[in-house]
Amino acid sequence: MKAGCSMVEKPEGGGGYQFPDWAYKTESSPGSXXIQLWHFILELLQKEEFRHVIAWQQGEYGEFVIKDPDEVARLWGRRKCKPQMNYDKLSRALRYYYNKRILHKTKGKRFTYKFNFNKLVMPNYPFINIRSSGVVPQSAPPVPTASSRFHFPPLDTHSPTSDVQPGRFSASSLTASGQESSNGTDRKAELSXLEDGSAADWRRGVDLMSSRNAVGGGGISHQKRKPDIMLPLFARPGMYPDPHSPFAVSPIPGRGGVLNVPISPALSLTPTIFSYSPSPGLSPFTSSSCFSFNPEEMKHYLHSQACSVFNYHLSPRTFPRYPGLMVPPLQCQMHPEESTQFSIKLQPPPVGRKNRERVESSEESAPVTVPTMAPIPPRIKVEPASEKDAESLRQSAREKEEHTXEEGTVPSRTIEEEKGTIFARPAAPPIWPSVPISTPSEEPLEVTEDIEDRPGKEPSAPEKKEDALMPPKLRLKRRWNDDPEARELSKSGKFLWNGSGPQGLATAAADA
């Protein structure tokens, strides 16, 4: 393919198309690979004699229908010197173009394809042009050329800076782009109005802000260029009679601008150029000469915002946005005494059930206890070395009561703790009850004496729990194997099986 190839007129065409020499070569012999299938299809489409074989689809841009597939395949085979060509092979070649995005099949229509001219028209390709001729059907699509793809409006002649600095915004580009022809004289009048004193100091302020922006935002790579001459889109806020104006009490008189109208608080006061500026130095509302906010003004401003939202159903997102505006705090500062009144107190986390019981019991015993009481040692659960029966426990509790009564303290805490521990972890019923259940004839004193004589016979709480779960026969066997002292007592006849030998054993098994 040649880059700058000449356009060769097809001698027998007459259809108005001009093909580049890479699409059609008159000197190419049959069978040469000088032409591609889509070039050949375009060639058939431009010929009037093949209108019954292949034609443009009516009403669609770039769409064509193959009316006689076998005839198109025969013509393509003759051109490529392949007599065995049929439509199956040709459609496979067309499917290759699907992946290349040159053309695609139209869904729902048989033998209908559509050229993707956006892909075909490439910058380094010469373009296929269509002449206005009666032979070409009206439905045939005009193949786009480079000039028809992009439309750039001509540069504005009224812009004073367009010749020197074409990349910058001009003063006329701030106005509406749709009024180019009708507003030419208005623009000239606006530019002449720029030369008065107010425009001069506006320009000075703009230059000052641009220099500050260049110093402050030097690290930003994509810095937006600022125009040299700029029209203020909105007049500066002055003495407006509108009661809902946010700046009704502003002492600054209004300046002339393009849109000298009372500004609604829901409109953006920042011009469009400033809205997207990367640094707050571009905004004309950041300088100290524009606004001096006092509490009354802020109150009025917030009230007008609320009115605009509630009365006109506006979204709060349409409020004025000032990119770099730092609102000073209100002057009525609170005294430090008042501010320290409302100190935040962090509450401790809620206590659990056991801690709650301890706190309640300590609160009950607090007013009665002596203030010089020794700190209570931490409760540590220890497995008892020698188990006692219920009576010995009661006796020790009574001794503790007497001891605490002598010291002048109430034993309610110890009793509460005893009850709490008993309630929190109920022990399994003892396997060898100290009091006989089934036989009233036996003396209970003798049994208790015998049991008190042997230390460490009653199992601890986890053992009790295990024994309660296992069957009585296995329990008896384990007890018999683990306790040689019990066997000696039973041999000597001192140990009583819950009162009456086998009967007591049977009742114990029945209870379990």
UniProtKB/Swiss-Prot annotation:
One cellular component (GO) term of this entry: nucleus
Post-translational modification Phosphoserine, affected residues: S139, S159, S315
Intracellular or extracellular location(s): Nucleus
N6-acetyllysine: residues carrying this PTM: K388
UniProt xrefs under SUPFAM superfamilies: Winged helix' DNA-binding domain
Gene3D superfamilies: Winged helix-like DNA-binding domain superfamily/Winged helix DNA-binding domain
Basic and acidic residues: bias regions: 380-406, 453-468, 479-491
Chain spans, region Disordered: 138-196, 341-512
General function of this protein: Transcriptional repressor that contribute to growth arrest during terminal macrophage differentiation by repressing target genes involved in Ras-dependent proliferation. Represses MMP1 promoter activity.
Pfam family, one: Ets
PANTHER family documented for this protein: ETS, ETS TRANSLOCATION VARIANT 3
Entry's family note: Belongs to the ETS family.
GO molecular function annotations of the record: DNA-binding transcription factor activity, RNA polymerase II-specific; sequence-specific DNA binding
Record GO biological process: cell differentiation
Name of the protein this chain belongs to: ETS translocation variant 3
UniProt keyword annotations, A-Z: Acetylation, DNA-binding, Isopeptide bond, Nucleus, Phosphoprotein, Repressor, Transcription, Transcription regulation, Ubl conjugation
InterPro entries on file: Ets_dom, ETS_fam, WH-like_DNA-bd_sf, WH_DNA-bd_sf
Positions bearing the Glycyl lysine isopeptide (Lys-Gly) (interchain with G-Cter in SUMO2) cross-link: K381, K388
Acidic residues bias spans: 443-452
Residue range(s) of DNA binding per entry: 35-116
Polar residues bias spans: 158-184
